[in-house]
Amino acid sequence: MAFNFIRAAAAGAAMALCGVGSVHAAVNLPALKIDKTQTTVSGLSSGGFMAVQLHVAYSATFAKGAGVVAGGPFYCAEGSIVNATGRCMASPAGIPTSTLVSTTNTWASQGVIDPVANLQNSKVYLFSGTLDSVVKTGVMDALRTYYNSFVPAANVVYKKDIAAEHAMVTDDYGNACSTKGAPYISDCNFDLAGAMLQHLYGTLNARNNATLPTGNYIEFNQSEFITNHGMATTGWAYVPQACQAGGTATCKLHVVLHGCKQNIGDVQQQYVRNTGYNRWADTNNIVMLYPQTSTAATNSCWDWWGYDSANYSKKSGPQMAAIKAMVDRVSSGTGGTTPPDPVALPAPTGVSTSGATASSMAIGWAAVMGAASYNVYRNANKVNALPVTATSYTDTGLAASTTYSWTVRAADANGAEGATSAAASGTTLAASGGGTATCTTASNYAHTLAGRAYAAGGYTYALGSNQNMGLWNVFVTNTLKQTSTNYYVIGTCP
């Protein structure tokens, strides 16, 4: 079908009104009346890999099934960016499927993922475009082989006969089918969301082709469940009217995971509103949950190779656990109740600086009642890689004879930050001279490979000083100065 300009114009108008977020403040994710046996997940690209991770690691939750578009086998990258961009995308002949099956069984026996027996009755829908130049069809072939070890062949549908590039496929919205590019949604005259949902759930009512109620879209506070780790502060949901507060319907739940460069910050609400899921949700009482990565995450991708955590594919993976917590919350109601908004923590008081050296400064503050941790900001940029549980922090890697300003925010047990403190300033001491530092200029990715830096939450941090170097990728370049063993600061050599 040709691009639907009327629908595109309407969608554009809606997004113009809403902007990147909503005209309303984000609310807490509601607790709804959900049949927990009817919980499924699907995703595209990095979201496809994440959908597989959730389906396998949390198989007790997602036993009903999963839909995967341009994804790959569980733990395909084995914690390596080289594997991720190589065998798991471009060169699928190198995928060690039998090893990945063995790892799955081992982890299940250790309890770090759910028992694989939960997958025995799952439904799985797989899709690969014949023109996909990002995740080759051979990767999806390997995924089918992987699933053959756990899911009956009769329960798997694999569609790979549409000349589509790397995109979420629809029947009336997006780029031409053979186009690769933002928003990575393509009109291929095929309702992929509908095909997946009908395979996962069986016969469904006809979709709603009319304009969907604006009030059914909810922007929720994602920071209740996770802070940083490559995830945004808010997520989205589509809640049919019968499933909302006060409704009597018992509803299904489907988790939708966007691909790289497809979050709200990248493509506004196009993936949330125009991929076809909500039309089916509206007439079949299916709540659609759209978790969001942040633009700070590597390429806005989900963590399917370990850019944020070595445990990325286990139940303990930060992004995995956050999405599971969202599912648990939205499934915990008996009739659409919404938890009260939390009381924001007050700003820390008594923020001060002390103990200046040529390259460091100690920052202290008074404890805040109810705070689980604190975050320290220098000149409005967060400097601590991990939550600070004490009431002091030493900021390192500073330039000599330079004045800086620090503020502090308290965070609750969910990582939600309170108000910002008053600023405290301090000036580092003059350099004492002596010695010759070694400087290296390279991409953030190269710095991490060489051990001069590390990646966390989609950002790169200098080893030792923990200075924030920006996004973890091959495009951002920094010069790191080694001032002592395993200690690097951002700077230049004289």
Curated annotation (Swiss-Prot):
PANTHER family: POLYHYDROXYBUTYRATE DEPOLYMERASE (PTHR42972:SF8), TOL-PAL SYSTEM PROTEIN TOLB (PTHR42972). Residues 347-431 form the Fibronectin type-III domain. This is Poly(3-hydroxybutyrate) depolymerase. Residues 1-25 form the signal peptide. Catalyzes the hydrolysis of poly(3-hydroxybutyrate) (PHB) film, producing the monomer and dimer of 3-hydroxybutyrate (3HB), while the 3HB trimer and tetramer are not formed. Induction: Induced upon growth on poly(3-hydroxybutyrate) or poly(3-hydroxybutyrate-co-3-hydroxyvalerate) as the sole carbon source. Optimum pH is 9. Is stable for pH values from 6.0 to 10.0. It is an enzyme of class 3 (hydrolase). GO terms for cellular component: extracellular region. It catalyses: [(3R)-hydroxybutanoate](n) + H2O = [(3R)-hydroxybutanoate](n-2) + (3R)-hydroxybutanoate dimer + H(+); [(3R)-hydroxybutanoate](n) + H2O = [(3R)-hydroxybutanoate](n-1) + (R)-3-hydroxybutanoate + H(+); (3R)-hydroxybutanoate dimer + H2O = 2 (R)-3-hydroxybutanoate + H(+). The lineage of its organism: Bacteria, Pseudomonadati, Pseudomonadota, Betaproteobacteria, Burkholderiales. It is found in: Secreted. The keyword Cytoplasm does not apply. Is stable at temperatures below 37 degrees Celsius. The stability of the enzyme decreases sharply at temperatures over 40 degrees Celsius. Belongs to the AB hydrolase superfamily. Lipase family. Its EC number is 3.1.1.75. Keywords: Hydrolase, Secreted, Signal. One of its GO terms (molecular function) is hydrolase activity. It comes from Delftia acidovorans (Pseudomonas acidovorans). The active site is at S45, D132, H166. InterPro entries: AB_hydrolase_fold, Esterase_phb, FN3_dom, FN3_sf, Ig-like_fold. Poly(3-hydroxybutyrate) (PHB), a homopolymer of (R)-3-hydroxybutyrate, is a storage material produced by some bacteria, that is used as sources of carbon and energy.
